[in-house]
Amino acid sequence: IWVHFGSGNIFRGFIAQLQQRLLNMGLSDKGIIAVDTFDFDIIDKIYTAFDNLTLNVTLNADATVDCEVMAAVAEALKADAHQPNQIARLKQIFAAPGLQLISFTITEKGYALHRPDGSLIPAAAADMEKGPSGCVHAMGIVAELLYHRYKTCAAPLAVVSMDNCSHNGEKLLSSIREVVNAWLEKRLVGKDFLDYLTESGKVSFPWSMIDKITPRPSEAVQKRLEEMGITGMEPIITSKHTYIAPFVNAEKPQYLVIEDNFPNGRPPLEKAGVYFGSREVVNKSEAMKVTT
């Protein structure tokens, strides 16, 4: 029911925790499928190597720590055009009418199709030239998967940016639409696909506000875990220069406000502490965050 793009610390330390709470409360029996479009070492060395489990270390104000094993990730996949089996599995998932939402923590630059001078990023340009097959840019990959969903079942779906940038849903929609319009101009897809994404009411791009600090893995936390008898927690540096560990350390405060626009339903995430409301509520929450 839920696919998340961006397998880094904000996902592991916050988003996956939300689904874990629902699992703990018996309000869901489903996990999240984690997908990475950029740093595939994370999937191999942090997810697969640890059976998709993460140790979440919460740093409390009184200097104590709370440790919890997160087991909400049911599957971890690489959106890698050079690994056809991974793409085939993703397309199988996107063809399922029961998929309710796909979400993102890929950073604001993950949505960018253009360089600062306005020219297209080469990966984005290549995707827009060749159409919905073998895409490599995150936005091309998602557009390709959405096209597969449209062709197979055309079921509703919420496409939810959870990245820390204002009007994030608008940014995500704009990038997807630009890719699809390029395909449409070359007659690689029909206008019916664009209408499905933007006019049918079947696909939504809700806005959200997120507030959570997940710093890089702390050596002090790792040492503390070792003193508790928890070993094998050494951080790694991936080939894409991500510094990441089998554990996530973060302070306790966290907020997520999402525009409640889910045409295929959604998990009861309000029970896990997520706030839902109108787009106006999201905007006001964003203003509150940046001005207080």
PLM features: residue spans?
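Substrate/ligand-engaging "lid" and interaction regions
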Residues: 1-292
